[in-house]
Amino acid sequence: MSILLAEITGNIASAFGLLGAAIGVGLIGQKAAEAVGRNPGASGKILVQAIIGMALAEGLGILALFLAK
């Protein structure tokens, strides 16, 4: 019974970690699109910063997945 409980707890923890990463990536994309809309000339710099932010958010999500399993 305790093994099943540990598996369920790990799955829930990894789901919350990945949910947070998905929300973070979505917010970064939203704000990057807004920033490009306000200042189209800086789209190159905004894109680079957005990709770095998305990579960090996804990295934390993957870390949560591995730590929970």
Regions found by a protein language model. Name each.
Residues 1-69:
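Hydrophobic, small-residue-rich transmembrane alpha-helices and their short perimembrane loops
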